[in-house]
Design a protein with these regions (language model features):
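Accessory RNA-recognition modules of RNA-modification enzymes
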Residues: 1-102, 120-143, 148-156
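Short, conserved catalytic or adaptor-binding loops enriched in Gly and charged residues
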Residues: 98-101, 113-117, 182-183
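Short Gly/Ser/Thr- and charged-rich N-terminal loops/segments
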Residues: 106-120
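Small/flexible residues
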Residues: 109-110, 149, 167, 214
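S-adenosylmethionine
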Residues: 122-204
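Core SAM-dependent methyltransferase catalytic element
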Residues: 202-214
Length: 214
């Protein structure tokens, strides 16, 4: 469609409200394609993430902050990472729309700032395979990669970081099966649920809860 974007009429963005959470979405930013099934996806990820009290949540491939913004109030700190700059801008706006105070550091709020709800939240414009999350010590990681799956280095880094729990949201079960060959060496499947986000197609959104082996 080209790189030039011009708003002919209206605000140039759309807004969705999922389970009471407000989301602003720009034209180039990713958001869940099925707004009617999105609440089921969100509630499943929330369930599979478990108790986030006093925990650090890392949301990789976070898009406009669909999961991160909704779960941040329950966690000690939340970090979202996404390649697309427009999506990260939206994610920061979405945090503010929902009474969260985003920071520019790894979950630490600017001096003098305090979150109105939950813990600190920050969003970072970066490739997942190039983002250094080792210093984060994430307890729970949400993975929602594109249909092409995860970069091999990102997968290796996640395994090396040793989060206690991973919630993997996959729209391509073939790539998920390939990645599970490696993940299954270190993680057990605790639960799995398929959500029909793409009616009348052969595709489903597969959500899997993985727990670190003892």
């Amino acid at each position: 469609f080209g790189d030039d974007q011009r708003v002919i009429d209206g605000p140039g963005v759309i807004e969705e409200r999922i389970e009471g959470i407000r989301y602003r979405i720009s034209p180039n930013a990713f958001f869940q394609t099925n707004s009617y099934a999105a609440p089921m996806l969100l509630s499943t990820v929330r369930e599979f993430a478990g108790d986030l009290s006093d925990k650090t949540l890392l949301d990789l491939y976070c898009g406009t902050g669909f999961f991160a913004v909704a779960l941040a109030a329950q966690a000690k700190q939340t970090i979202g990472v996404e390649l697309v700059p427009d999506a990260i801008k939206d994610a920061r706006v979405n945090a503010e729309l929902n009474s969260l105070t985003p920071s520019n550091s790894l979950g630490r709020l600017p001096t003098g700032k305090a979150p109105m709800n939950g813990g600190g939240i920050s969003f970072h414009d970066a490739k997942t395979e190039e983002f250094n999350w080792m210093e984060i010590n994430a307890d729970v990681v949400i993975l929602d990669p594109p249909r092409s799956g995860m970069h091999d280095k990102a997968l290796a880094d996640i395994i090396a970081a040793k989060p206690a729990r991973i919630v993997y949201v996959s729209c391509n079960y073939k790539n998920f099966a390939r990645e599970m060959v490696e993940l299954s060496k270190y993680y057990d499947i605790e639960a799995m649920r398929a959500i029909d986000m793409f009616p009348h197609t052969p595709h489903v959104e597969l959500v899997t809860a993985l727990v670190r082996k003892d």
